[in-house]
Amino acid sequence: MTCLAWNTTPTLTDLCRAIEQHTAPLYLIVCLPENHIPDFSLSNQPSELEGRLNNRLVQAIKCLQFNNVNVLENLLPDVHLWLVPPHRTDRLHEHFPHIEWQTKAIPQSTPTPLKPWFRRPEHQAAPEHVLIIGAGIAGAATARKLAEHGVRVTVLEAGKTAQAGSGNRQGLLYAKISPHNTEQTELLLTGYGYTRRLLEDLLPDSDAWGDDGVLHVNFDDSERKRNQALGLQHQHKHLYRSVSAEEAAHIAGIDVFSDGLYWPQGVWLNPPAVVHALLNHPLIELHEHSPLTAVSHNGTQWTAHTPNAHFNASHIVYCMGAHSPTAADTNVSALPFRQIRGQTGVVSASPFSQKLRCAISGESYISPSWQCSHCYGATFVLNSNDETWYPHEEADNRAALHQLNPPLAQSLFSDGLQTPPLQSTQGHAALRCDSLDHLPVVGALGDIAAMQSAYAKLALDKNYRLDNITCPYLPNAYINTAHGTRGLATAPICAAAIAAEILGLPHPISQRLRTALHPNRAIIRAIIRQQPLLSV
């Protein structure tokens, strides 16, 4: 692994020369001089390699964000480009173990010491075979990322692939962000571009996604205030911009009766198609209808038991979504999760609704027609574990659609929104998993009972110095879950983060985010509050 860095934007000729002179895997790190999309200028007589690289870059840089690093994977086979905004160029040590500067080096900041429970596990073994528990978007993306690096993966799914939170007919890739640089905003912006580029590579010619953008209408004063603040962030005007009601109508193809915020690279997509495409790899073995009933570690490997078989592997990653609270390992199930019930509807397109060119989102959403049908919704019921489809929630979704766009709803339903009959609608009901602080749970799994013992003094003083006590992690065990309603934007980048942890690769997210997402945050918080997650 070679990591080359420039303190300004190099020419394509410079990049191609570096590619030709070094052996893959190769990481090309460009420290951007300003918060603008860089211009990688072509030479007067570009080489074949320069032309190929330019063609890949034209599409890949459309979704750059300037909150954190941008990871552009496999622009050429095993050649990865990282674009770093100016305020992050002194923190490359958070991502790369070593760097070879091709220009004058940018001085690096001193790393901030980490609490022991946020440090990486010591003495990590190289993966021989990895078990992934769960075949939704998080499990599929994690499996794919490991397989692309030559690791054999077995995926165990309790039911059928992409039938829970990843089972909607049409979902939206978007980033409903704050105008402030919160951890969630950083994650959503980083993940948004990452998933957008993933779609281009994974399903370049598929009709299972559409790239006409997502329009967020200002449905109340709070939403208008948030979107207007975002619209003033000119460094991201290529990602999102404020639009008037007239421009919004022109973009959507129908009147939307409101101004809003337009994401031109936003997409609707069919989540099951994405999940199946991710799992389509020769090193991935999928077992459906294989619920995990027990798990054990014998000192060298994990054994996962299902009703009909058992599976051995060196590593295990839990990507169980809404099933996380019932995981066979209490080090997963004891973590504090919230289940959120959601239901969507599907209706045949009308002549009027077929004019809709982009997805519209407000308090509810509707996608453009795909295969002559629209998907719309969704309900949001906290702390529910009921996956039954209900007519009364279908009525709620129709009413919400009518509030979002009355002419559109009236063209799709008649008789006071009662036709077609509520019971006949083909929709989807499923549970989503969320954490108490609304951030995903991603990283190495701690041994909860051992941590409660090792760090018990935090219950008396949350600032007690315990820096010399190594965190008792479970051996080679990880988690990627609790993506809530934002999994399309967050799960793939978190899958890349898990792969980086397991394989020792450059890390695609900042240390700030790794700390914010770490599963140990909940364990330590519970100890400090004298509310231990496990009774010992």
Show where each model-derived region lies.
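Beta1/beta-strand and adjacent pyrophosphate-binding region of the FAD-binding site
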Residues: 4, 122-138, 154
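Helical element adjacent to the flavin cofactor pocket in flavoenzyme catalytic cores
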Residues: 261-307, 311-315, 319-326
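C-terminal catalytic lobe of FAD-dependent flavoproteins
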Residues: 414-536
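Helix-loop-beta segment of a Rossmann-like dinucleotide-binding subdomain
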Residues: 179-180, 205-216, 242-280, 379-382, ...
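Dinucleotide-binding Rossmann-like beta1-alpha1 core, especially the glycine-rich loop
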Residues: 171-251, 423
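The AdoMet/dcAdoMet-binding core of the Class I SAM-like
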Residues: 2-109
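Flavin-dependent oxidoreductases
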Residues: 141, 186, 307-399, 407-426
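Glycine-rich FAD pyrophosphate-binding loop
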Residues: 148-167
